[in-house]
Amino acid sequence: MAPHSADTAGLVPSDELRLRTSNSKGPEQEQTLKKYTLEDVSRHNTPADCWLVIWGKVYDVTSWIPNHPGGSLIHVKAGQDSTQLFDSYHPLYVRKMLAKYCIGELVPSAGDDKFKKATLEYADAENEDFYLVVKQRVESYFKSNKINPQIHPHMILKSLFILGGYFASYYLAFFWSSSVLVSLFFALWMGFFAAEVGVSIQHDGNHGSYTKWRGFGYIMGASLDLVGASSFMWRQQHVVGHHSFTNVDNYDPDIRVKDPDVRRVATTQPRQWYHAYQHIYLAVLYGTLALKSIFLDDFLAYFTGSIGPVKVAKMTPLEFNIFFQGKLLYAFYMFVLPSVYGVHSGGTFLALYVASQLITGWMLAFLFQVAHVVDDVAFPTPEGGKVKGGWAAMQVATTTDFSPRSWFWGHVSGGLNNQIEHHLFPGVCHVHYPAIQPIVEKTCKEFDVPYVAYPTFWTALRAHFAHLKKVGLTEFRLDG
């Protein structure tokens, strides 16, 4: 749909923009392209042999991996369709660089069914007018202001404050005072700072939006391992699954459910009688999110090789070491040291630890759930592996903001109050989101793309629990 506003000054016309950004080859080259199936591509799934599918073409990017500015993100979906991740992480001009790595085109085959949960086709994949325009506008903002979107000076100060607060509260909770109430006070702060590591440090680090220096960004991403959870598994679930297939049932691992399950977030999912009360008991169970991730989910993903519909990629030796050594380091400083040098009995220590993890779990659950599990968002139902709507427009339709221009919530939530902007531009440091938010909202209005922003966090949280109550009472429907 064309914009219904005449305010397009400085924009490249859509047709010209397509020509300038298209990665397609000429007619003679098209005829020489080899044909590959998804099964063929899936065999090339390591950093040493990395093929990607982007807009139906097959690319061998193995030689580019050592020079890739985004570091390991280039092979996070090695051997799979990476269309959505490629486009959301790269400026438009990078499309032109793809041609040199093109080795063929994707063709359907009888064996495609086993890869269907890793591939989803959106309308207007390469030439979605809304996305081309909003990307051009946001890129122009950063270029005209001479700003690197991956960098913001506040991030270093913020990270030092969070990590310092985490370890200070850890010490004060377990080693400083024998008073249970004093220790509980600091244990709760430890839980708060652990959540802040999750939303403010590792989130940007694992999205490649913390810094332009690859090694440093990777280290900041591994801060999640420092607080007990796995950065590798987080990238698989969040970057590979959630960002590619937001709110699409049976594709997005963030809304996955078993049958039966304690939670139901869409009417296309199985309903049990107790879902009528999920808006009550989930308020409590959300607190177990961090504990579940640390002690159960990460290991299940490793040993089963999947996170819901997402097939877990092969670990590199470095990723393997970070995964297991991170778990051992966490167990050592969190359990061994307090048991040897701490001032509390085993039972008191365990109670303090669980209390801290409940705070972490509630913070993470509430901040993420209000963005995608409310009545005002869409839960797309694909037909034949296709979604009716462009990928970018569907990112907006499946996501909400809250307090989008709040300095306080921008920092406390790690930019999750600007989830729409984050889903469109995951490679941008979250501190920049308030600046580009008006650009995104304005463009959405011009293209009739629904843009939902709750005025406060509490409004968004109430909307989430109202949705849980409504869905818990609604009968199963195939059409959502």
Swiss-Prot record:
Q: Which amino acids does the record list as binding heme?
A: H68, H90
Q: Which Gene3D superfamilies match?
A: Cytochrome b5-like heme/steroid binding domain (3.10.120.10)
Q: Where is this motif: Histidine box-3?
A: 419-423
Keyword Iron belongs to the record:
yes
**EC annotation?**
1.14.19.30
UniProt-listed Pfam families: Cyt-b5, FA_desaturase
Q: How does it sit in the bilayer?
A: Multi-pass membrane protein
| MF term (GO), any | acyl-lipid (8-3)-desaturase activity
Q: What's the stated role of this polypeptide? A: Fatty acid desaturase that introduces a cis double bond at the 5-position in 20-carbon polyunsaturated fatty acids incorporated in a glycerolipid that contain a Delta(8) double bond.
Q: Where is this motif: Histidine box-2?
A: 238-243
InterPro entries named in the record: Cyt_B5-like_heme/steroid-bd, Cyt_B5-like_heme/steroid_sf, FA_desaturase_dom, Fatty_acid_desaturase
Q: Coiled-coil region(s) at which residues? A: none
TM regions (residue ranges): 151-171, 173-193, 280-300, 322-342, 348-368
User: Residue ranges of region Disordered?
Assistant: 1-30
Disruption phenotype annotation: Defects in the fatty acid composition.
What is the similarity comment for this entry?
Answer: Belongs to the fatty acid desaturase type 1 family.
Keywords, in A-Z order: Electron transport, Fatty acid biosynthesis, Fatty acid metabolism, Heme, Iron, Lipid biosynthesis, Lipid metabolism, Membrane, Metal-binding, Oxidoreductase, Transmembrane, Transmembrane helix, Transport
| UniProt domain Cytochrome b5 heme-binding: residue ranges | 33-107
Query: For this chain's UniProt record, which GO biological process terms are given?
Result: lipid metabolic process; long-chain fatty acid biosynthetic process; unsaturated fatty acid biosynthetic process
Q: PANTHER family in the record, alphabetically?
A: DELTA(5) FATTY ACID DESATURASE C-RELATED, FATTY ACID DESATURASE 2
Name of the molecule in the record: Acyl-lipid (8-3)-desaturase
One GO cellular component term of this record is: membrane
Q: State its cofactor.
A: Fe(2+)
